[in-house]
């Protein structure tokens, strides 16, 4: 065991990381038991182990062991802030690991699941609220209105979205049967006990992630490293 601000890993694995990248360290993949949401500050060849590199990170020192696992977690925001274009990716980043921007929105999908406030579910039926002051979990009346269709009870790639002329922006899957190359090419998760909506997927979602990727299978009390939110306004 060694306490410090670096972890030594195989060179081919360590070279996947970059300065400024968000990382976590734990007892296994997706574990943050040792360090959560740190940033890589330096990567250099190990002087102690052949064909290995030391990946340095910010924050408090960590007790590293031979079984500790380094992995890429949610990426910090701001990578595209200097871009002049509303769309694209950071110049020179072509390895599939860079932040992207669409209509000025950074990492619209694929970095973290983004919680959609104002959309509650009860047995596949969605209830929608457009009054931010009235947002609340497990509310299906009052400021929350019943959407004019029931979501699909089968998960899979999205083939069709429901349409309610009162709330056209909701776009919840009603028919699955697409694929990663046909129809909307994004996935839909569901469960009878699902109560909230998360969108976009996260860093480990792979090909199923996308702007229309919806998770409607979580309860309102669920939390995890890969679920967050996005501010809709700034004062």
What are these regions (language model features)?
Residues 8-10, 75-109, 163:
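Short, well-ordered junction/capping motifs at the entry into regular secondary structure
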Residues 4, 20, 37, 100-112, ...:
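Extracellular structured ligand-interaction cores
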Residues 1-56:
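Autoprocessing Asn-cyclization modules and mimics
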Residues 15-30, 61-85:
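Extended Gly/Ser/Thr-rich low-complexity repeat segments
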Residues 28, 60, 108-111, 115-120:
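An acidic- and aromatic-residue-enriched active-site/binding cleft used to recognize and process polar
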Residues 112-120, 139-235:
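C-terminal, surface-exposed recognition/capping segments
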Residues 27, 41-42, 81-85, 101-102, ...:
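Short acidic-hydrophobic catalytic motif
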Residues 122-133:
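A short, polar/charged loop-to-alpha-helix boundary motif
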